[in-house]
Amino acid sequence: MFDSLVDFLKTNIDELNGHEVQISGEFKEHHNEDSKYIIKNWLFSSSEYRKWRITRLDGGKKLQVFNTVAYPNFNSEMPILGADILWFGNSQKLLAILDYQPLIQENKYLEKYCSSLGSIKKKYSAFDNNKMKNIYDSKKYFSPWVIICRGNKLNLDRDLNNIFHSFVKNYLNINKSNPVNQFLNAEEIKINQIKYDKYSFEKDPADKLFKSFFGEKWTKKFINKFLFTLNNEIIH
């Protein structure tokens, strides 16, 4: 499950003339002690994106997880693309969060880079159905148009692929239009991406999930050296 999403991203990154970045073997594929859970990771880079990572967690019929985050280069004030998709097999429940995560919360910035998510939300209104404000701080690195789904197998089978494809294609099209930086310079962009990683390091709910499957030692290394690598950067 979700392998088609990985393949879709790889195809689009390839069209950007992106290349795969070699990562440590312990991150590329890692099994828990009884091999019931397997995590696989990929890292890519291109002229537009300094880091585009993909994570797949296979827990068999019990749990399936897909995550991807795309960081633009420091010369682009574009938001960060972020997607978390989880399928809980026992309860037949889908949880999905898709967003163009803004570097700042200024209204004109949000309108320029994130508002086109609104048309996707409208088209797939049955998929976008829960604000979950108790989990995500909308005043930080989430746009007003964040797509959040607490769904079922119908949403998984009928909607997920289409909405994910639209979500990624629209984001890439925004970048292809070569938007001129209006709000941040290169130094400010880097600082805000560092702040994003620090915030995510503290708040990402996947931390507990990974610890329960793969242990605290591996998870700490994975988060610092693969997921949020700017977390240890010092902001001057």
From Swiss-Prot:
It is an enzyme of class 1 (oxidoreductase). The keyword Membrane does not apply. The keyword Magnesium does not apply. Signal peptide: none annotated. It catalyses: 15,16-dihydrobiliverdin + oxidized 2[4Fe-4S]-[ferredoxin] = biliverdin IXalpha + reduced 2[4Fe-4S]-[ferredoxin] + 2 H(+). GO terms for molecular function: 15,16-dihydrobiliverdin:ferredoxin oxidoreductase activity; cobalt ion binding. GO terms for biological process: phytochromobilin biosynthetic process. Keywords: Oxidoreductase. Pfam families: Fe_bilin_red (PF05996). Catalyzes the two-electron reduction of biliverdin IX-alpha at the C15 methine bridge. This is 15,16-dihydrobiliverdin:ferredoxin oxidoreductase. It comes from Prochlorococcus marinus (strain MIT 9301). The gene is pebA.
